[in-house]
Amino acid sequence: MCVKNTINLYIHLLKPFSLRKLFMKKKYLLLLLLQLCLCGHTFAQYPKMTKLLYGVAYYDEYMPYERLDKDVQMMKDCGINVVRIAESTWSTVEPQDGIFDFTHIDRVLNAMHKGGISVIIGTPTYAVPTWMVKKHPEILAITPSGQNQYGARQNMDISNVDFKFYANRVIRKIMEHVKDNPAVIGYQVDNETKSYGTSGPNVQALFVKYMQAKYKTLDNINKIFGLDYWSNRINNWADFPSMNGTINGSLAAEFAKFQRQLVTDYMAWQAAIIREYKRPDQFITHNFDFEWRGYSFGIQPDVDHFAAAKALDIAGVDIYHSSQDKLTGAEISFGGDVARSMKGNKNYLVIETEAQGFPQWTPYPGQLRLQAFSHLASGANMVEYWPWHSIHNSAETYWKGLLSHDFEPNPVYDEAKTIGKDFARLSPQLINLKKKSDVAILFSNEALSGFKAFGFGWGVRTGYNDVLRQFYDGLYHMNISCDFVDPSSSSIENYKVLIVPLLYAAPDSLLQRLNRFVKNGGHIIHTFKSGFSDENVKVRTTHQPGIIEEACGIYYSQFTVPENVSLKGDLGLSAADKKINTWMELITPTTAKVLAYYDHPVWGKYAAITENNYGKGIATYIGCLTTSAVTDKILADAVKKAGLWNEDQQLSFPIITKSGVNQKGKTVHYYFNYSDQQTSFTYPYNNSKELLSGNSVSKNTAITLMPWDMKIIEVD
């Protein structure tokens, strides 16, 4: 992909020339050959990290008055040892076409280096300058809502050749300028990249080429996607319609997959450029974000995180969450587990998280510490706040930073000072925490897209991530460590318990692989609407749930919306907890044992939840949307049967515990109190040391946690 992007770029650079003249332009040809060689022989390499990074995003460009030296001193007092700069300021770096001004970058690099603070440089390509749009208005993406207007960030078409020409140029200019600066430790590719819904004529043309390459003939496309319906059949490639108006959910899902591929290619293209310049001791990362619901909630629908992360040396994420009485730590844990899983259970960077944020996010005393160390407990090697100082103008004025608008020390800044001190002091014990999970959640962007098109029905807001989070949160509350895998993962078979929510769209090969997982001794939990359609979101012509019925020992052909339906079975739950909603499948068991039937005068003969012994393993199937209490019970049962219920499961939310092995080979246990009530528990492990206090801890010692408090205990 790097090679293809390089060739495309140079073709664009030389498009005014004939082919003969192109090869006469020796300097361009040499550059092309050089980059092709670099693309072929340079790969992502995980960086060696020797200390915890504690940082902020810093914008000298936004400052209302001169205070750089004072900021550096306040950062040093706070224990800040890294800043990220430049990712939002293309119009400052290149105020006019081809005119570059590195004043702010140089000022910050010099000041930070003098202060002993490292710098991550972001490529400034997610917010385009005015002169570019004036010169090339077609850079603004056309979406199903029409052409974007200038003003907002992320309003451009990332596949536009003119945009990529300028992006390539500004990245190279910055890299040439900063690559040898000793303060620079790494580079961030773009910022929270997505396709931004780009779907204009040039994107549609690229999609047609993609479809030609993948499906070869229109007959194949018409058959696979069912385009005879409503006279959608395409009989000539020239007649291929825009996807903006399609009513075919299968074709829409394919276009969504193509748009995600644009993101993967775009990030790989930027990473390849940076890799030409960066030093061996510098890394490449990116700040992936998540489905946004006023905070970081679920799997990002618009990016294939695992695919896009392949071009990076280390994964990075932005994690924002509720605070005060709504702080649970679940979003910190979820985002961290996804990030750690992106690069095969490798440590990651939290590139953005909140210090204060919106008014409702101002943390209670103790919560900032709880949050920072919760990131480390999931495997983070860096925690970086956005931003350092609250901004005085424009869209994010009240997305407050570590400093408020007056730039003065405040309770959050004072608490951050204690974090910085502890990060520096405990870095040898806490950095590079290695985590091992026996439970994983299989997520699928293809299933997410398919379910978006063919979900629960009109007017139902419950989506893919709602169901996934119900299972994840259940594991989190029970202190069960969890990884994430996707269909491309080679490690699926390494787990003892695999949770597969809403696998609506999947190829036969994946479903057969999941059956083998069970047959070979794994315990799988499938949910409703799994196995329903193939990878092209075409509903299978067999009994549902398709191929997995073999391992699950069930089948069904009817489903409906539950009205006043509960579960009937030995669940040990209250009547309210046994209520179901939104969706129910009318399941007939073949070899499966029924765990719960529907409690209903008509549907009562059908199974709702089943369990089947298949080969050496167990397949649980949940045919309806249940309460969290039911989900938790099923999860706990699976974990116990897999032999994974241990000391940590004697504790539950609001006491959250996480553990891992540090670089000294010692096990570290984190204990967090996510509540405003004092609580206590009995420490179950052998002689240890509490790292924050330095106190010794012996087995069966009573540990007290104050509100929003924590302990970090290293086993001797």
Language model features: what each stretch is:
Residues 31-39:
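Bacterial N-terminal signal peptides
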Residues 43-82, 95, 110-111, 429:
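N-terminal carbohydrate-binding accessory modules
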Residues 54-63, 88-103, 149-166, 193-197, ...:
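The substrate-binding groove and active-site-proximal loops of carbohydrate-active enzymes
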Residues 62-77, 296-308, 364-372, 487:
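Short, acidic/polar
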Residues 69-76, 84-148, 270-278:
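Aromatic-lined substrate-binding rim segments of carbohydrate-active enzymes
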